[in-house]
């Protein structure tokens, strides 16, 4: 019987074989998984985030950091998806130079204005003023806080402080 899972757009395609849609590119699999067939999911692992960029998910999983989806070589474990890692993601008009995801070394503090809607605590960037070099300064959700002072994020409410916080305060 001819396999109809190319592409698998309807449930009738999955009578003899299942198919998995990786972004917009369907692939045939030999056995049915625990999840329903023919679902437009990027990864088998439940911890993989939805892929916003179709080109990211041809052969890899993807994870969204800030506003940009990032391709990774393998699916993460469920425990890692709630913890942001250092990925080279550009936020707003400035590109923060983080180290690669998965490295044990901590991110180098950078000075960029965070304009993402919900910036993740990726590289702990300081203020626009490079004199604010303390690694404990949290990402600045409010750009107005970062012109001459540092800001500390408490939950989702940023507050401006008059000077850089000490490493013990964050």
Swiss-Prot record:
Residues 8-168 are annotated as: 17 X 5 AA repeats of C-C-[RQVSGE]-[SPTQ]-[TASP]. The keyword Repeat applies. GO terms for cellular component: cytosol; keratin filament. Keywords: Keratin, Repeat. The keyword Repeat applies. Belongs to the KRTAP type 9 family. This is Keratin-associated protein 9-2. It comes from Pan troglodytes (Chimpanzee). The lineage of its organism: Eukaryota, Metazoa, Chordata, Craniata, Vertebrata. The gene is KRTAP9-2.
């Amino acid at each position: 019987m001819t396999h109809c899972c190319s592409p698998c757009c309807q449930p009738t395609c999955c009578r003899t074989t299942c198919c998995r849609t990786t972004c917009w590119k369907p692939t045939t699999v030999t056995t049915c998984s625990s999840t329903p067939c023919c679902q437009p999911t990027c990864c088998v692992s439940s911890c993989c985030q939805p892929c916003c960029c179709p080109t990211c998910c041809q052969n890899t999983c993807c994870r969204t950091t800030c506003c940009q989806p990032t391709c990774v070589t393998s699916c993460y474990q469920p425990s890692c998806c709630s913890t942001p890692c250092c990925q080279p993601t550009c936020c707003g008009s400035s590109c923060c130079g983080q180290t690669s995801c998965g490295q044990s070394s901590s991110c180098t503090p950078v000075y960029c204005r965070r304009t993402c809607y919900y910036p993740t605590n990726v590289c702990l960037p300081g203020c626009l003023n490079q004199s604010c070099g303390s690694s404990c300064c949290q990402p600045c959700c409010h750009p107005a806080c970062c012109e001459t002072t540092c800001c500390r994020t408490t939950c989702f409410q940023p507050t401006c402080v008059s000077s850089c916080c000490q490493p013990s305060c964050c």
